[in-house]
């Protein structure tokens, strides 16, 4: 009697298990494969998907979770997003400034165009008024100065970073001076740096010329440090070129002598080469005081 009852109980339990198994199989068979959602998406696949989305959509996904916010803000993802070949043509920005009234400026951004030989610009009302005299663009960042402070603006995230001023300069604490900033990138270590030149001359002939070179590494807790104290005194030009981790710009040591300065962003080493000229030529020089015309 006891054995028969035990056997019946075991058989009943087996039937329940088989019934549950068949029910799960039926539900899977009825499920539409088009609406099936995977429980887990590998991170590398997730990154590949996100890098092919428009920038505005990527910024919205930062609100999904802390993990997504950290992922989309990571340096790896930002670099990956820049090199994906399927991304649309990047926007071009233009700033128009009234030379007689620096408080009047107009920011334009490129609009979609059907012709590869022309550009169409519209007024961009999404970017805040930035000001400044010179705008520099590097890897999607807009760099400018206002009130003698260096500022970096990300047009994709609408984030603005204001860097501290140089407080230990011997020139800034004295008479009127010229100050000019350059933004550059180290592709080996993937680091951004600012090079600042502070210069002073008593007249247009660059008499009593003095200059200083300062570097700021864009990282948490970064600060200005003075470098190359033995570098020749000079007045830099606002024309510069970033190429393969090296910053190039022109500088004047006197009204008739111009040199090409190269700055290795990674090693922070400077090199110079005199610009060739014919006898008697006077090289053009930037207008005195133009670099500190900021507001």
Swiss-Prot record:
Transmembrane segments: none annotated. Gene3D superfamilies: 1.20.1280.50. SUPFAM superfamilies: F-box domain. Pfam families: F-box, FBA_3. InterPro entries: F-box-assoc_dom_typ3, F-box-assoc_interact_dom, F-box-like_dom_sf, F-box_dom. Residues 35-80 form the F-box domain. This is F-box only protein 8. It comes from Arabidopsis thaliana.
